A protein has these predicted regions:
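Conserved NAD(P)H cofactor-binding loop of Rossmann-fold oxidoreductase domains
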Residues: 21-26
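Substrate-binding pocket helix/loop in short-chain dehydrogenase/reductase
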Residues: 29-31, 37-42
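Active-site loop-to-helix junction immediately N-terminal to the catalytic Tyr of the SDR YXXXK motif
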Residues: 33, 80-86, 100
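Active-site helix of classical SDR
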Residues: 53, 89-90
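A short, exposed helix-loop element centered on a Lys and neighboring polar residues
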Residues: 53-54, 99
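Residue(s) in the substrate-gating loop at a strand-loop-helix junction
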Residues: 73
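SDR active-site lid
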Residues: 102-168
Length: 172
C-alpha cells in the first residue's frame, strides 16, 4: 500500500473512492496451514485495507468527499466454523472497522460501507479450489456479482454502514 500511495501522489492523482476487495481463501484447518500462509492471509484481508484507509482517509476528509467500500462477507456476521478459520474473523474485523469509521466520519462527506455478500458467482471458488464444495450449495443461495456490486455502490452512496445483498442473507 505504501508504494501504491506514493506512486499515486507522485502522479498527482487524487483518490476519492477506495474499494478494498482483495482476498484469497485458506480452505484448510488452522493447525494444518503454515504461519506464513496465515500471515499472508491477514496481510491481504486485514492489514492492507487498514493501511490503505489510513493513508487515504485524511485527504478524503480534507476534501470533504470520499467513498470507501470494504468487501467483507456475511461470514463476518455468523459464528465461526471449521476450516477457513481466519476468514470469518477477518471479515468481521472489516465490518467493525467500517461501522466505526462510518460513525467517525459523519458530517465529513466521507462514507464508509462494509459490503457483506453471501455466496456470489465469481472465479473466487475456482481459484481457491473450493468450487466442488460450493456446487453442493442450493442455487437459491447464490448471488450474481453485478447485483452485489450495484447494492454495494448504492449503499456507500447512501452512507449505509453495512450492506447485506440478497433477501436470503438478510435473515442471517
Amino acid at each position: 500500500p505504501r508504494a501504491l500511495i506514493a506512486a499515486l501522489e507522485g502522479e498527482g492523482v487524487t483518490v476519492d473512492a477506495l474499494i478494498n476487495n482483495a482476498g484469497f481463501a485458506v480452505p484448510d484447518r488452522y493447525r494444518d496451514t503454515s504461519w506464513d500462509v496465515q500471515r499472508d492471509f491477514l496481510q491481504v484481508l486485514v492489514t492492507a485495507p487498514c493501511e490503505l484507509i489510513q493513508r487515504l482517509l485524511p485527504g478524503m476528509t480534507a476534501r470533504g468527499y470520499g467513498r470507501i467500500l470494504n468487501v467483507a462477507s456475511v461470514a463476518g456476521l455468523m459464528p465461526g466454523a471449521a476450516s477457513h478459520t481466519l476468514y470469518g474473523g477477518a471479515k468481521a474485523m472489516l465490518i467493525k472497522l467500517s461501522q466505526s469509521l462510518n460513525s467517525e466520519q459523519k458530517g465529513t462527506g466521507v462514507h464508509v460501507t462494509a459490503l457483506c455478500p453471501g455466496f456470489t458467482y465469481t472465479e473466487f471458488h475456482d481459484v481457491s479450489g473450493t468450487r466442488e464444495a460450493m456446487r453442493r450449495m442450493p442455487k437459491l443461495m447464490w448471488l450474481k456479482a453485478d447485483g452485489v456490486a450495484r447494492e454495494g455502490y448504492d449503499a456507500v452512496m447512501k452512507n449505509r454502514a453495512i450492506c447485506v445483498p440478497g433477501a436470503q442473507y438478510k435473515t442471517i
